[in-house]
Each structure stands twice: as C-alpha cells, then as structure tokens.
Amino acid sequence: PILQGESTTGIFSIDFYDKNNGYAIGGDYTKPEIDSLNKIITRDGGKTWKTIANNNNLGYRSCVQYFPNSNGKKLLAVGFNGVDYSSDSGLNWKHLSDDGYYTVRFLNDTTAYAAGNGKISQFIFK
C-alpha cells in the first residue's frame, strides 16, 4: 500500500510501540511534497498494514519514532524538510519546524535528539 516503483521511493523508517502497534513512514525524497501513500500503520504486529493520514500535508519523512510511555498515541517524524508531531497515533500531524533532520531518537518521555544536515538538536516536550 506504500508509494513504490522508483529507487527514491518506499519506506525509510519503521517503529513499533509494542508487539502489535507499528508505524512506518517514507515517500519519495525527490518529490517530498507528495503526502499520500507514504504512511502506514499496523495494529496486529505487522500481519496487515493500512495507509493512514493521506493528503494531510505530511510528505516525505526519513524517520519516525513513538514517544515512550504514550500508549502509542504520540509520534515524532523528521525529514530534510521538517519536523512533525502527532498526538493521535499518526492520523493527524502538526508541523513543528522547517529545520531538516534525517534521524531522531528519544532519551525519555520528554526528550528527543534529532540529527542531520551537520547538526544535532535536542527537543524537549512537556
């Protein structure tokens, strides 16, 4: 169900909150504005996947991570074209920054580190 067919398309990141709930993100990094068929979700441990949040202005992203201890509700996604946050399991996204990153990891429930474009940044969430 994901955008594919070119060497620049596909899934670029996957994260699981627990053994059942997972989210994958990607797209086409040469056409980062395409915001459909680039996000998929599973609720059964990866047996089935469905597209989610199509046409919601969240185009290509290179990394997605669940917030620890968020019951699988909160996600952070980064890419060379920005940072975005979801509080509803990835259905809707809020754009936080135009700063570009390639990867992100959480230190704890409220602190994440993102890296890319020659920089490392800390994000603090309340």
Language model segments and positions:
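Residue-level hotspots at or immediately adjacent to binding/recognition sites across diverse folds
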Residues: P1-K126
